[in-house]
Amino acid sequence: MPGVLRALLLLAAAAPLLADVNVMKDVTLGFGQALDKCREESQLTEEKMEEFFHFWRDDFKFEHRELGCAIQCMSRHFNLLTDSSRMHHDNTEKFIQSFPNGEVLARQMVELIHSCEKQFDHEEDHCWRISHLADCFKSSCVQRGIAPSMELMMTEFIMEAEAR
């Protein structure tokens, strides 16, 4: 009996972490829906567009300005930016809360993004600034254990493709 109790306690402790990862997965997939609409505006080649599917991989790097331009366009699509291309806190929080269990991560994600935004506020080129910000955000999520694994993301991509 003590072994069963210990297992239940471990599951109870792990459940919030899994919920956080699943929320992040859902937000990532939802945000990614704007990518097709932003491809031309941000001058993404097919090859660079494919890179977005690897965003959560450990070795993914933001080396191309166009990726930042695409993220800027996608953020505008969902009305997540102010006129000065900075995060609109309220709209971003509401966007995250619109996903199942989004309230679990909304405030934390806004704080992470804002913290990264402050680090790169000196960058005048919006696309490069947003690219650096996205890299910082990704690293922060990985450090906090809320980043979805590539296996989880690939499973979702496959399930979505099969559903179409």
From Swiss-Prot:
It comes from the Eukaryota. One of its GO terms (molecular function) is odorant binding. Residues 1-19 form the signal peptide. Present in the aqueous fluid surrounding olfactory sensory dendrites and are thought to aid in the capture and transport of hydrophobic odorants into and through this fluid. Belongs to the PBP/GOBP family. Pfam families: PBP_GOBP. One of its GO terms (biological process) is sensory perception of smell. Antenna. SMART domains: PhBP. This is General odorant-binding protein 1. Disulfide bonds join C38-C73, C69-C127, C116-C136. Keywords: Disulfide bond, Olfaction, Sensory transduction, Signal, Transport. The keyword Ribonucleoprotein does not apply. It comes from Heliothis virescens. InterPro entries: Odorant/phero-bd_Lep (IPR006072), PBP/GOBP (IPR006170), PBP_GOBP_sf (IPR036728).
